[in-house]
């Protein structure tokens, strides 16, 4: 997000790291989760800095979904979470409803990653709801990442409803942020021989 500076008007986020940086006790249990712990510590300062500097352009999920006692989907407002009790597996319906208007008003929308554990139908609502909203617009839409493109196929959406779909999420982000792409550089060098 930091590399995109003023080129982006609005960020609609569903990730646990951003919620943690904003002071909400969500995310994975960090005990025994070395990979998540390392990722969080590596990104913490950057995320907190971006939230501080661009907070007016960033919207975080307002509610989250988890597995209720009956095994079904349950939702809770983020503001009502005072301690980590559940594994939050998707954004909630209010978040999707809140994200739809800015998506529909945009000239361009870029998506990287799913908003929930979409492989489990109970927790696909966030991912599918946002992808549906994007698919219904006339704006330029870029979708990046293997999971996101897989969700398109799993839930009956058509890649034709999006301007660009990439299964290479990392390369997609590097291209958006202007970082060099080694494969493209190699092709350019070969073409100039």
Question: Where on the chain are the PLM-derived regions?
Answer:
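Active-site loop-to-helix "anion-binding N-cap" substructures in soluble metabolic enzymes
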Residues: 1-193
């Amino acid at each position: 997000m930091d590399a995109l500076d003023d080129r982006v008007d609005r960020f609609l986020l569903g990730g646990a790291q951003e919620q943690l940086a904003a002071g909400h006790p969500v995310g994975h249990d960090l005990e025994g989760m070395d990979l998540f712990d390392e990722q969080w510590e590596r990104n913490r300062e950057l995320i907190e800095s971006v939230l501080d500097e661009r907070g007016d352009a960033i919207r975080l999920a307002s509610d989250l979904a988890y597995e209720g006692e009956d095994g079904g989907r349950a939702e809770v407002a983020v503001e009502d979470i005072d301690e980590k009790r559940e594994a939050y597996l998707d954004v909630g319906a209010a978040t999707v409803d809140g994200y739809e208007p800015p998506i529909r008003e945009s000239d361009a929308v870029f998506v990287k990653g799913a908003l929930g554990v979409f492989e489990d139908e109970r927790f696909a609502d966030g991912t599918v709801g946002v992808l549906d909203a994007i698919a219904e617009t006339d704006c330029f839409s870029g979708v990046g990442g293997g999971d996101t493109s897989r969700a398109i196929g799993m839930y009956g959406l058509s890649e034709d409803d999006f301007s660009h779909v990439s299964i290479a999420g990392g390369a997609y982000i590097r291209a958006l942020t202007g970082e060099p792409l080694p494969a493209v550089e190699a092709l350019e060098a070969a073409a100039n021989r």
